């Protein structure tokens, strides 16, 4: 092999290796920043089609309804713990250390984003509440079987302020 071809071959191999290394690093970075959506049943039992469960320490989003009577607040801090369930009977505990959205309440749909702990609790970094009576994130509506109930505020009387 003459020196010119050897130089071209070395350059081509180095270029292909560099592109492969950059692609690998890019895919690794994207994978670590990926937030997958799970329902409480999928966290407990795994995805229905693949059986895959989220790993401990994985960043995920979980959506469902806040279980009535499950909310526990720490009176000395902003720490709150509540359970999220879906129509299939799965339930996941969520802990959150910040102010909850104004529209957050028990029995309503939410999406919580955070890290799954070793004890199966989601340590949430963000909690999103349903923002009006018609909206529900598509993933949550599908997971809940669209069984959420719209609250009717028009029939409630305002308290007498006199």
Curated annotation (Swiss-Prot):
Residues involved in heme binding: 131, 135
Periplasmic side: 30-162
Ranges of Polar residues composition bias in the record: 153-162
Residues in compartment: Cytoplasmic: 1-8
Topology of the protein relative to the lipid bilayer: Single-pass type II membrane protein
Chain intervals for the UniProt region annotation (Disordered): 143-162
Compartmental location: Cell inner membrane
Any one biological process term the GO annotation gives: cytochrome complex assembly
Keyword Ligase recorded: no
Transmembrane segments: 9-29
Keyword Transmembrane carried by entry: yes
One GO CC term on file: plasma membrane
Domain of life of the organism encoding this protein: Bacteria
Chief localization: membrane
Keyword line: Cell inner membrane, Cell membrane, Cytochrome c-type biogenesis, Heme, Iron, Membrane, Metal-binding, Signal-anchor, Transmembrane, Transmembrane helix
Gene Ontology molecular function terms on file: heme binding; metal ion binding
Alphabetized HAMAP family for the sequence: CcmE (MF_01959)
Protein family: Belongs to the CcmE/CycJ family.
Summary of the function given for this chain in its UniProt record: Heme chaperone required for the biogenesis of c-type cytochromes. Transiently binds heme delivered by CcmC and transfers the heme to apo-cytochromes in a process facilitated by CcmF and CcmH.
Protein name (Swiss-Prot/TrEMBL): Cytochrome c-type biogenesis protein CcmE
Native species: Shewanella baltica (strain OS185)
